[in-house]
C-alpha cells in the first residue's frame, strides 16, 4: 500500500546540500567558539562550497527569484511549477552559461503563462523583474526552440478574451461594452 501511494509534491528540494555550513564564530546559544572549532567550520564550509556543482549554484540563485517574481505577479502555483520545469531544463542544457539568469527566469515564467493561457503580458513581467525586454526576448526564443519541444509543451499565442475583460475592468467599462469587444 505504501509503495502504491505517490507523493504529490517533493518533500525536500532536489538540489544543493540539506544543511548549510556557514563560517560561524558562535554556537547555538551565542557563546564564542574555540579557535580550533572556528577553523574546522571554515574548512567544512569551503569544502561544501566546492562540492556544489554549477547547476546547483544556478538553482540556488534562480529558485528564489522565480518565487519572488511569481508572488509579485500573483501567479498560481501550477504556473510556477511549469516555469520551474522549464527553467531546470534550461539549466540542464546549459543555456544560461554567459547569459542572464534573471532573463531566463522571467522568460521561463512567461512561457509557462502562455502555455496555461494566463492573462499576463511580457511587459508586465519585465517591469516587475526589472530586466530588459530585449534580453528576455532572446531567452524566450531559446526556450521556445530548445526546451519546450523536449518537454512536449505547446507555446500558444495569447488569446484576447481574458485580456479584454481584464483591461475593461481596469478602464471601468460596462459589461455591455465588454461583451461587444
Label the model's feature ranges.
Residues 1-181:
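Non-catalytic, interaction-prone regions of core transcription and DNA-replication machinery
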